Amino acid sequence: MFLTNLTLTNYRNYEYETLNFGEGVNVILGENAQGKTNMMEAIYVLAMAKSHRTSNDKDLIRWNEEYAKIEGRAEKRSGSLTLELLISKKGKKARCNHIEQQRLSQYVGHLNVVMFAPEDLNLVKGSPQVRRRFVDMEIGQVSPVYIHDLSQYQKLLQQRNHYLKMMQARERSDEAVLDVLTEQLVLLAAKITLRRRQFLSLLEQWAMPIHYEISRGAEQLCIRYEPSVDVSEKAELSRIVEAYSETFAAMREREVQRGTTLVGPHRDDIAFFVNGKNVQTFGSQGQQRTTALAVKLAELELIFSELGDYPILLLDDVLSELDDFRQTHLLDAIRKKVQTFVTTTSIDGIKHDIIQEAAIYRVHSGSVTAPS
């Protein structure tokens, strides 16, 4: 798939901009703080209906304006696609092929993207929350049902935590209410756990050979899912439900004392091992970067295997973070098969011929000069 057109209205520092893109590599060139990353973010938001940089949608709206709008046209193997996302202080409205989507979970997945930015190097060395967010966003692109289940889980989790806090303060003591909330939470938690495990198993299958090649045959990558309940790697949904039910029962007294839910997908983690050692704890910076790069390239292949279309790749100021060998491997891997957007302050340090042949868009103060 590839994005043929992007139109921004009142988005960040863009008042109005409309651009056409080629199927290959598109370089967004400019000094810092001119709007390069804002454009990359806009493409990401168009696809995912949320930003990777902020959780506050108001940040996306241009100063002193009431709304921001992102519009895009794309070509997929299944046909043409038009997308529109309106962001106001009241919320978001999304349209796909001019049809308003009742829920954002219906909208996400029509356009697929993989973002690789400097902060994605924290995928390995960052907090468990970073890794959970990564997994959830990627599964959501290929499974709208997962987005719905995750949203329902988060709402129920808030309700359960609120009730636990009231029980902690002795404002409520009805165990039956907690039983109902727990029972509803258990099934959703089990579904999320099962889907995460399946996704990470597939991701590992794609990432292992990529990592082996980038490390020039010196390293073997293993991705381990660490759920908050003790279940075997081959456990079916019914067994995962049992495990959650048993664990919640055992933890109830502690949860009431703490006033919060101590078990569930919101406490999962993912660990990356290279040659049997945890990369987060024992890996060098080079190993951490190789692992992050291998995972990002594996995402491309996994989405293609699931959907039959390669996603759009967004490389936001990340090439400068990679050495020449990793740069070359990344750019060779995407050649002629993945539409790619690259932001950089200069192309001089990028020697690969794929960049030299790219379409160059120059950004200055929220205005873009397209290639002639």
Curated annotation (Swiss-Prot):
Q: Which GO terms describe its biological process?
A: DNA replication; DNA synthesis involved in DNA repair; double-strand break repair; SOS response
Alphabetically sorted, this entry's keywords are: ATP-binding, Cytoplasm, DNA damage, DNA repair, DNA replication, DNA-binding, Nucleotide-binding, SOS response
Residues the record lists as binding ATP: 30-37
Q: Where in the cell is it found?
A: Cytoplasm
Write the protein's name.
DNA replication and repair protein RecF
Instruction: Name the InterPro entries on file.
Output: DNA-binding_RecF, DNA-binding_RecF_CS, P-loop_NTPase, RecF/RecN/SMC_N, RecF_2
Fetch the Gene3D superfamilies from UniProt. P-loop containing nucleotide triphosphate hydrolases (3.40.50.300), RecF/RecN/SMC, N-terminal domain (1.20.1050.90)
Q: Which GO terms describe its molecular function?
A: ATP binding; single-stranded DNA binding
Q: Which family does this protein fall into?
A: Belongs to the RecF family.
Key word Transcription present:
no
Which GO terms of the cellular component aspect does the record hold? cytoplasm
Task: Name the domain of life.
Answer: Bacteria
**What does the protein in this record do?**
The RecF protein is involved in DNA metabolism; it is required for DNA replication and normal SOS inducibility. RecF binds preferentially to single-stranded, linear DNA. It also seems to bind ATP.
Instruction: Give the organism the record lists.
Output: Geobacillus kaustophilus (strain HTA426)
